[in-house]
Curated annotation (Swiss-Prot):
The organism's taxonomic lineage, starting at the top: Bacteria, Thermotogati, Thermotogota, Thermotogae, Thermotogales
Protein name, entry field: Leucine--tRNA ligase
Catalytic activity field: tRNA(Leu) + L-leucine + ATP = L-leucyl-tRNA(Leu) + AMP + diphosphate
Organism the protein comes from: Thermotoga maritima (strain ATCC 43589 / DSM 3109 / JCM 10099 / NBRC 100826 / MSB8)
Cysteine pairings via disulfide bonds: none
PANTHER family, A to Z: LEUCINE--TRNA LIGASE, MITOCHONDRIAL (PTHR43740:SF2), LEUCYL-TRNA SYNTHETASE (PTHR43740)
Enzyme class: ligase
Residues at which ATP binds: 583
One term of GO molecular function: aminoacyl-tRNA deacylase activity
EC number: 6.1.1.4
CDD domains per the UniProt record, alphabetical: Anticodon_Ia_Leu_BEm, LeuRS_core
Length: 824
């Protein structure tokens, strides 16, 4: 028998696929289109099996859809700009581009070894000039349409990465990438006006029926829509007004203090001269605190009384103005009305600073005494101490108070979003340069489209100074104004790498087009992506930004669709020793080592067999060994059968007995089940179980029936359908089997195996015979037998007679197709 040598077989078939351009995708076809896409990787080094999981999932989908008659687009590329490349330059003295290209070459080789069906002619890297030229073009489209702007802003600053971070890149007050505590700086920065799209980004989530609900919930929470009122509180002895946004205008009568965010410009405006020094000390102390943790209910509340008062517009009362550490500029207006009786953070603050507590909402069943309250009452209730609204249920009061405020001209209805504009400036080198020029005479001038790309210079010093390395490169910085021709300077910040990945799925359509980012006809044929696959960690950032950029390009007339991804699948992680794989933990499993030891087909099947693909799974060496044993058993079974079926076909197949009928029924029912498993939610683990079950049934037949009685036509049908169903999961093995069955064509070019509904019909059924509650016998009978005939057959069986002879039968119960119950 031929020996299984996976490395030889896999290399051979990968070369055949490449040579014959099997996965090259034509732009147009008579077939329906299917765009299968896996999130592209950041090329930081080598891939581990956790990364490989989603590429394998994507490949099953692409290969299956190809066999179902679709024109499949299945491309690959690299999210190649970013901080680690620059950090490598600083630490190891290697140029970011060289480091990146080396890693890309490694990843490409790793992915090819897996036998993934990518159209390599469409490969992209976001650091290629032919790519980032169009990232810059997208920036210009946003700029021209008022969606890109520059302003001085309090920004998140990572002292270690020496760059600005978007809000989304800060987790619990720490830099998402390096874990350093984030500080605040005031810098001139570029923003994209994503807030203009907040309502559409929110509402259109309802259109995304092919997305997991938890991902949509994460986006809804991030956008964070709140409906309430904006109210102006006049500052005593001044023309200044403090505007607050509140979702609880029904509590206005309970306001006993105002609080400003430490970052609010009003703080400097309102502080009296004699308090400035003391205030500065307070602000310095607060700046050291974790900005995001300081807002939590549990965090220690700190405040500074400014010595100024505001007037409550509904009661006319004087209320003290504080600066408070738990207020952030990011939310609402950066100022709040303090209602200690009905907000826990305000309650803690008021208790600490001796501020009065005034109850204005009481539960229906009891009164509240402010002196005895140990925590705020935040529930619904009846409005009290609230002037004209006394006795109003608070649930109705919100709407009534807003209407009243508008009538009186004190406030107005308002919708606010937690979402903030997307900060895209980065003070780093390895990113797409922002295509803007500054001219003393003409001001801010966009680079003309015909002058794109603004190229990154190669000869740059990578000192982590907190300024972009480009700001020290005179050759890059100095330029001519495209309007007046005078001396000018380039913008030296580069774009957030999330800008690069916000449109890459559009570029795969025409990856090497020189005069535009994509052909409108092609992009509107292929997009939206039919199936997008990637980690849930990108639920907010990448997916939200991609939706935003797609909507902008749609509104500007470049796209016919305004949502980029029809279906989204988020795969689970692979853990080792109970933890996420990482080099620092030393628990990384290398796909290269697994392929060397077991072959890519075993690795692919094990990754899919471990657990449902959306679930996290623990890597097990014993588990991959078990799958490898199955693969070898499959190989041996196939080559045992091959000599008997190689010259055979399946025409005029005759089934001679019930064993053959049952075997063929199992074949077709398993093919049906595997098809349903793939179609109905990517149940790849149970699909592979189906393949294993089929091999078991085949082995049982071969072992129990003499060779000379084997039904060769039936065996030919089984190994053919088995090979076809195997091919998305273990494509190299399937190609070898298909070739050795005498086919000149490739298995990847075949249709998915069909099942015969007639073969699924059961002609005979095994019935258990239970006497007084215990199974005593079994009988095989025609499936449509009448109860009368069945009773006669059962009572004539010797084994049954032993228990019932001479005894009156009280009951004879038949559960159709399953069991007979006799009570004597």
């Amino acid at each position: 028998m031929k020996e299984y040598r996976p490395q030889e077989i896999e290399k051979k078939w990968q070369e055949v696929w490449e040579e014959k351009k099997v996965f090259y995708t034509p732009q147009r076809s008579e077939k329906p289109k299917y765009y299968a896409l896996v999130m592209f990787p950041y090329p930081s080094g080598t891939l581990h099996v956790g990364h490989v999981k989603n590429y394998v999932i994507g490949d099953i989908v692409a290969r299956y859809k190809r066999m179902r008659g679709y024109n499949v687009l299945h491309p690959f590329g690299y999210d190649a700009f970013g901080l680690p490349a620059e950090n490598a330059a600083i630490e190891k003295g290697i140029h970011p581009e060289e480091w990146t290209r080396k890693n890309i070459a490694t990843i490409r080789q790793q992915v090819k070894k897996l036998g993934i069906s990518y159209d390599w002619s469409r490969e992209i890297a976001t650091c290629d000039e032919e790519y980032y030229k169009w990232t810059q073009w997208i920036f210009l489209q946003l700029y021209k349409n008022g969606l890109a702007y520059k302003k001085k802003a309090a920004v998140n600053w990572c002292p270690k990465c020496k760059t600005v971070l978007a809000n989304e890149q800060v987790k619990d007050g720490k830099c998402e990438r390096c874990g350093t505590s984030v500080t605040i700086r005031h810098l001139e920065q570029w923003f994209f006006k994503i807030t203009d799209y907040a309502e559409r980004l929110l509402n259109d989530l309802d259109k995304l029926t092919g997305w997991p609900e938890h991902v949509k919930t994460m986006q809804r929470n991030w956008i964070g829509k709140s409906t309430g009122a904006e109210i102006d509180f006049p500052v005593e002895g001044s023309d200044t007004k403090i505007r607050v946004f509140t979702t609880r205008p029904d509590t206005l009568w309970g306001v006993t203090f105002m609080a400003l965010a430490p970052e609010s410009p009003l703080v400097e405006e309102l502080v009296p001269e004699e308090k400035k020094e003391e205030l500065q000390e307070f602000l310095e102390r607060v700046k050291q605190q974790d900005r995001f943790r300081r807002t939590s209910v549990e965090a220690e509340k700190e405040g500074f009384f400014l010595g100024r008062y505001a007037i409550n517009p509904v009661t006319g009362e004087r209320i003290p103005i504080y600066v408070a550490n738990y207020i952030l500029m990011e939310y609402g207006t950066g100022a709040i009305m303090g209602v200690p009786a009905h907000d826990q953070r305000d309650f803690s603050f008021a208790k600490k600073y001796g501020i009065p507590i005034k109850v204005v909402i009481k539960p229906a069943d009891k009164d509240l005494d402010p002196e005895k309250m140990e925590e705020a009452y935040e529930g619904e209730g009846i409005m009290v101490n609230s002037g004209p609204f006394d006795g109003t249920p608070s649930s109705e009061g919100i709407e009534k108070v807003i209407n009243w405020l508008e009538e009186k001209g004190i406030g107005k209805r308002s919708v606010q979003y937690k979402l903030r504009d997307w900060l895209i400036s980065r003070q780093r080198y390895w990113g797409a340069p922002i295509p803007i020029i500054y001219c003393e005479k003409c001001g801010v001038v966009p680079v003309p489209e015909e002058d794109l790309p603004v190229r990154l210079p190669k000869d740059v010093e990578f000192l982590p100074t907190g300024q972009s390395p480009l700001s020290f490169h005179e050759g890059f910085k100095k330029t001519k104004c495209p309007v007046c021709g005078g001396e000018a300077q380039r913008e030296t910040d580069t774009m957030d790498t999330f800008v690069d990945s916000s449109w890459y799925f559009l570029r795969y359509v025409n990856p090497h087009l020189e005069d535009k980012p994509f052909e409108p006809d092609d992009v509107n044929y292929w997009l939206p992506v039919d199936q997008y696959i990637g980690g849930v960690e990108h639920a907010v950032l990448h997916l939200l930004y991609s939706r935003f950029v797609t909507k902008v390009l749609h509104d500007l007339g470049y796209l016919n669709f305004d949502e980029p991804f029809t279906n989204l699948f988020t795969q689970g992680m692979i853990y080792k020793d109970g933890a996420k794989m990482s080099k620092s933990k030393g628990n990384v499993v290398s796909p290269d080592e697994m392929i060397e030891k077991y072959g890519a087909d075993t690795l692919r099947m094990y990754i899919l067999f471990m657990a449902p693909p959306e679930k996290d799974a623990e890597w097990s060496d014993a588990g991959i060994e078990g799958v490898h044993r199955f693969v070898k058993r499959l190989w041996n079974t196939f080559y045992t059968v091959l000599p008997f079926v190689k010259e055979e076909n399946t025409e005029n197949l005759v089934l001679k007995n019930s064993t053959e009928k049952e075997l063929r029924r199992k074949l077709h029912s398993i093919i049906k089940k595997i098809t349903e498993d793939i179609e109905g939610g990517f149940k790849f683990n149970t699909a592979i179980s189906g393949l294993m079950e089929l091999v078991n049934h085949l082995s049982q037949y071969l072992n129990s029936v003499p060779q000379e009685e084997w039904n060769r036509k039936l065996l030919r049908e089984i190994v053919e359908k088995l090979t076809l169903a195997l091919s998305p999961f273990a494509p190299h093995l399937a190609e070898e089997f298909w070739h050795d069955l005498g086919n000149d064509s490739l298995v990847v070019q075949q249709s998915w195996p069909s099942y015969d509904p007639k073969a699924l019909e059961v002609e005979e059924v095994e019935i258990a015979i239970q006497i007084n509650g215990k199974v005593r016998d079994k009988v095989v009978v025609p499936v449509d037998i009448s109860e009368e005939d069945l009773k006669r057959i059962v009572l004539e069986r010797e084994r049954v007679k032993e228990y019932v002879d001479g005894k009156p039968i009280r009951k004879f119960i038949y559960v159709k197709g399953r069991i007979v119950n006799i009570v004597v």
